[in-house]
Amino acid sequence: MSAGTNIWRILLVAGCLTLPLSSVRAETNAPAPATFTTPPTSDADRFFTQYAKAVQLVRQNGRQEASVIMDLLWRNLGSSPWFEIALLKHAELNEISNAQVALEDYDVLRKRVENAPYFQGTADRAAVFRAALLGSAMRGTDRIRIQRIRDALETYSTRYHQYPESLAKLAIFNYIDMEDIHNSEGRLFHYTPTGQRFTPAISYHTYVIEPLAPEPFFVSSPKLDGTTQLDDKTRKFAALIRVPGHMDPHRVFEDQTLEGYFVAAVAAGGAIVCTPEHVLVLVAPE
């Protein structure tokens, strides 16, 4: 990544830079056309509109195209939590196809959550959102590191026809960086060489490494049946959400908890629900 891009990301982390959705047009001497006042599009509306498009592309095996949409989206959102959620989803899409970009996204996400005023304080929403986003970023980083370990183990096995006794040996022999054999909290990943043989020295021909399930870009459960605006004066909404084990939807509001899901945000286009470890985006049906 270029120095200019790094500076740009630093400004984003500090909250000193946002990007407009529309491109800048050249000034002309022509009189401005008559315009009609329309309600401004909020970051929440932008997020759910573009995220819904990305979900459709992922369902059609268009992950690369979906990644482009999410990349443009997070770069054009300026407010929390929509910026952070868009960045998280962009990172999740890139874990396999572009791991370095995903790692950079997770790094920016952690710093934003640690510094953005929205996630500070002791209120339930701030605390749950903060824990869920930080946990998602840490697990995403760990998934990438585990995959790097697997790749390094296969390279080692191709050369030596066995697996190493430890991950430390893998790093000492320069098959992987020392940082990548540790998780986000600095703990060495659990690795056990198996398939022991005596040929004549002891060698290992299989291994077990701690699993970490991928984070889904979208979920089918819980399911959002729709949203309703509470009144004409505010932009507050209620959500109708179906949770596993219940036939009927529940009408919920922001800051409520439903069967273990904390309703962190509700807008016209969808809702965000959190568990202590996950951030789930629920899109309103068309």
Locate each region found by the language model.
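Bacterial N-terminal signal peptides
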Residues: I10-P20
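Extracellular/periplasmic head regions of type IV pilus-like filament subunits
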Residues: V68, Q100-E104, Y118-Q120, D124-R143, ...
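Alpha-helical segment of the N-proximal tetratricopeptide repeat
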Residues: P40, D45-L72, N76
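Alpha-helical interface/anchor segments and their boundary "cap" residues
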Residues: I202-L230
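Hydrophobic/aromatic side-chain positions at a characteristic register within alpha-helices
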Residues: V58, N94-E95, T141
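Short solvent-exposed coil/turn linkers within tandem alpha-helical repeat scaffolds
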Residues: T41, L73-F83, L109-A132
